[in-house]
Amino acid sequence: MSASSAQTETPERYFLKVASANPFNPLILIDYGLPRAAKAIVRIYTAEGRVVNTLVNDTQPAGNYTLAWDGTDRNGTRVGSGVYFIMLETPEYSETKKIALLR
């Protein structure tokens, strides 16, 4: 599950942060910012580097965004407890955050 919403102020720089409790169950909120329009990709990876889910893969206007991930893979199947990584990628920037899901 993902929901993305742009907020009005434009950030001065790119960022990615976990906006809710970590470890999480059943939902985690993820904030990210784009200082200018860019192709943004936000993915969830396993600790082994396998893509679990792609939350965003689109050109987006500059702004602050919030995503929600409910611990499911791209097929909607619940993933198990464990360590996962959130990665924000743009042509100019990438950042990764470690998260933990406890079922």
Question: Where do the language-model regions lie?
Answer:
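Solvent-exposed serine/threonine-rich low-complexity stretches and specific carbohydrate-binding patches
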Residues: 52-60
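Glycine-centered coil/turn sites that cap beta-strands in beta-rich domains
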Residues: 2-46, 54, 66-69, 90
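C-terminal tail/sorting-segment detector
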Residues: 2-6, 59, 67, 77-103
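Surface-exposed loops/turns
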Residues: 25, 36, 61-62, 75, ...
